């Protein structure tokens, strides 16, 4: 603002995204494919959730895994692969399944990974999907209602209350959150204890 005149207008209705990326650096050294699968599954499920929020479907998915580029003791590796979906989708099962398949093809044993991510792109509105001749509308309706129910539960109770098993439970790979504020209203362990 200059002299009460707005210089930049605020866009209250942003246009839908063409690509969605979810990625995180690991809080610990990750070498096992199981930990990578948990992180990739979590990122893929979050991408699917974001797609449904904007009522879109993705035509392709990419998976990326990286080692630490600043570690001079180890070789740098960046694995990246993309595949197209037969039919554009926002279904969590389809997206997670494709992401895990891509991870299996780019994973190299013996490396210490620092970061993983999932990108879905070429997003179109979900009401403009053209089905192939082998997919029935009934299957899509069942999966859509399942995804809607899971999204509703997660929105009302909390993120990842209901999730795919491949996302894991412990999530030791997650980013360190040492300075996180306590959640007094949502976590029993964070409640204040008073002693008399």
Regions found by a protein language model. Name each.
Residues 1-110:
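DNA-contacting surface of Y-family translesion DNA polymerases
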Residues 79, 86-196:
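Acidic, metal-coordinating catalytic segment for phosphate/diphosphate chemistry
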């Amino acid at each position: 603002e200059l002299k009460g005149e707005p210089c930049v207008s605020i866009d209250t209705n942003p246009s839908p995204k063409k690509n969605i990326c979810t990625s995180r650096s690991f809080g610990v050294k990750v070498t096992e494919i199981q930990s990578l699968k948990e992180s990739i599954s979590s990122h893929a499920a979050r991408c699917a959730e974001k797609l449904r929020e904007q009522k879109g479907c993705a035509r392709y998915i990419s998976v990326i895994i990286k080692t630490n580029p600043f570690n001079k003791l180890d070789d740098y590796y960046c694995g990246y692969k993309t595949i197209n979906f037969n039919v554009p989708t926002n279904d969590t099962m389809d997206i997670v399944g494709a992401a895990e398949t891509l991870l299996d093809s780019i994973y190299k044993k013996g490396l210490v990974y620092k970061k993983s991510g999932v990108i879905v792109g070429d997003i179109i509105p979900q009401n403009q999907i053209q089905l192939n001749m082998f997919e029935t509308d009934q299957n899509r309706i069942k999966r859509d209602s399942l995804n809607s129910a899971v999204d509703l539960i997660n929105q009302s109770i909390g993120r990842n209350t209901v999730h795919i098993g491949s996302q894991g439970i412990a999530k030791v790979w997650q980013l360190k959150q040492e300075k996180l504020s306590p959640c007094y209203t949502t976590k029993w362990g964070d409640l204040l204890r008073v002693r008399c």
